[in-house]
Curated annotation (Swiss-Prot):
Disulfide bonds: none annotated. Residues 108-130 are annotated as: Disordered. Pfam families: Ribosomal_S9. It comes from Cellvibrio japonicus (strain Ueda107). InterPro entries: Ribosomal_Su5_D2-typ_SF, Ribosomal_uS9, Ribosomal_uS9_bac/plastid, Ribosomal_uS9_CS, Ribsml_uS5_D2-typ_fold_subgr. PROSITE patterns: RIBOSOMAL_S9 (PS00360). This is Small ribosomal subunit protein uS9. Belongs to the universal ribosomal protein uS9 family. PANTHER family: RIBOSOMAL PROTEIN S9 (PTHR21569), SMALL RIBOSOMAL SUBUNIT PROTEIN US9M (PTHR21569:SF1).
């Protein structure tokens, strides 16, 4: 007996998350650890739960996530994006609601590369007139 599960890939900065959701009681597991243990900051945990809370499906699905790369907030954003895609695979009618909240769009902001002759991406060395 196979349980129907839905999949979504999410990305944010350098993080990539593979999100699997299946009918359950609302348990969220990230890299084989509970959500509260994996993310220390409450804000990161809140970001992950946002799509489920928006569509009132928090207690309906068990979420299993594999995430790699980036920092904690990048990973949280990637999980949110993947979870949104998985929910849309489950029910396409949720798309408009999730789109309105801004969860469907991939946040394309990436770190700007460092340029030759500059200290960082845009910071120039101090200018000396004389």
């Amino acid at each position: 007996m196979s349980v129907t599960q839905y999949y979504g890939t999410g990305r944010r900065k350098t993080s990539t998350a593979r999100v699997f959701i299946k009918a359950g009681s609302g348990v969220i597991t990230v890299n084989d650890r509970p959500l509260d243990e994996y993310f220390g900051r409450p804000v990161a945990r809140m970001v992950v739960r946002q799509p489920l809370e928006l569509v009132d499906l928090v207690e309906k699905f068990d979420v299993n996530v594999t995430v790699s790369g980036g920092g904690s907030f990048g990973q949280a954003g990637a999980i949110r994006h993947g979870l949104t895609r998985a929910l849309m695979e489950y029910d396409e009618n949720l798309r408009s609601e999730l789109r309105k909240a801004g969860y469907v769009t991939r946040d394309s902001r990436e770190v700007e590369r460092k340029k030759v002759g500059l200290r960082k991406a845009r910071k120039r060395p101090q200018y000396s007139k004389r």
